[in-house]
Amino acid sequence: WTFGQGTKVEIK
């Protein structure tokens, strides 16, 4: 899991 802006969550 990678967290971007804090409001956006991307599943890798």
UniProtKB/Swiss-Prot annotation:
It comes from the Eukaryota. Coiled coil: none annotated. One of its GO terms (biological process) is adaptive immune response. It is found in: Secreted; Cell membrane. Its main location: secreted. One of its GO terms (cellular component) is immunoglobulin complex. Keywords: Adaptive immunity, Cell membrane, Immunity, Immunoglobulin, Membrane, Secreted. Immunoglobulins are composed of two identical heavy chains and two identical light chains; disulfide-linked. J region of the variable domain of immunoglobulin kappa light chains that participates in the antigen recognition. Immunoglobulins, also known as antibodies, are membrane-bound or secreted glycoproteins produced by B lymphocytes. In the recognition phase of humoral immunity, the membrane-bound immunoglobulins serve as receptors which, upon binding of a specific antigen, trigger the clonal expansion and differentiation of B lymphocytes into immunoglobulins-secreting plasma cells. This is Immunoglobulin kappa joining 1.
